[in-house]
Amino acid sequence: MQKNKQSIDEIAILLNGKASKKGLFVCGLNSLDLAEDSDISFFAGNKKNLPQLVNTKAAVVVLKKDDINFCKTDYIVVDDPYFAFSKLSNIFDNRKKIIPCTKESVKIGINSNVPKSSFIDDFVVIGDNVKIGENVSIYPGVKIENDVEIGDNSVIHQNVVIKENTRIGQNCTIFANATIGTDGFGYALDKNQWVKINQLGSVVIGNFVDIGSNSTIDRGALQNTIIEDGVKIDNQVQIGHNCIISKNTIIAGCVGIAGSTIIGEGCKIGGAAMILGHLNIESETTISPGTMIASSINKKGETYTGFFPFFEKKDWIKVTMFLKRLLRKWV
């Protein structure tokens, strides 16, 4: 991939930082240990990585003022190097830019609006009464059912399925193979037979939401499933019907959230955590990876950890038997 030369002076301005030397140029972004003498890198402050900072071959390192003495190369001082990294990743993203067009193989239903500023790739199917905003990009194989709305500047990657009546806000990104608006898991037991409950709600997604590959967000039974502004969802996440995920919550991969649970604003949910249904999780809660949440959390800003350490199988059996004996004593 061809690299573009970037001015350190201009980068420092974009990062709201101060460069150690003017007139330098860099051609790429890389980690401290892999950077070459034409690259820029960053040091987020983790002392475990100090040897990488000391020995890096990078031309320029973005770091905090406190870490200057460990750096043997030129640098840009900023308040938050990791946030600066997010800006650098945008500057050095050299992937091919999209030219607006609608490919011939696209199928568009009745009364659907596709602006000329949008990019609609091969074999996309768009249903009836669909409203697509300006500068939207939709990649091959996407299926959009009737009465869907997609806001400006959103990106829908390959093979995503968006079910009827779903609303997606502006500046959202939905990655490959995600499914939005499938039926929630609702059944009523009639004697010995499970009878399906039709899911009559939909899914409403706010602005600046990211949804990872192979994630599923179920439509509500009656009310809508809601994903508010700024939520970031990793790959293979399951969100059940009627859930509300509040603003700026971030959810790591393989998390399962059962139906009708409300997650507060600014929560952090670690990978493979399990959250049972009909719960309320207070804002700014952190849930550690692998933790099962079985009751509501009412304290703001706390961290909850509930995973059990693993053992060799023979030791696990001993621990299990010990716990059983303890239980008999308590009962």
Question: Which stretches of residues belong to each language-model region?
Answer:
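Residue-level recognition of short, solvent-exposed, well-ordered loop/turn junctions
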Residues: 36, 151, 204-206
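Short N-terminal secondary-structure initiator segments
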Residues: 1-20, 130, 136, 237-256, ...
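Glycine-rich hexapeptide-repeat left-handed beta-helix
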Residues: 158-331
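Right-handed parallel beta-helix
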Residues: 99-165, 169
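Terminal amphipathic alpha-helical/low-complexity segments used for targeting or macromolecular assembly
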Residues: 1-105, 166, 171, 177-178, ...
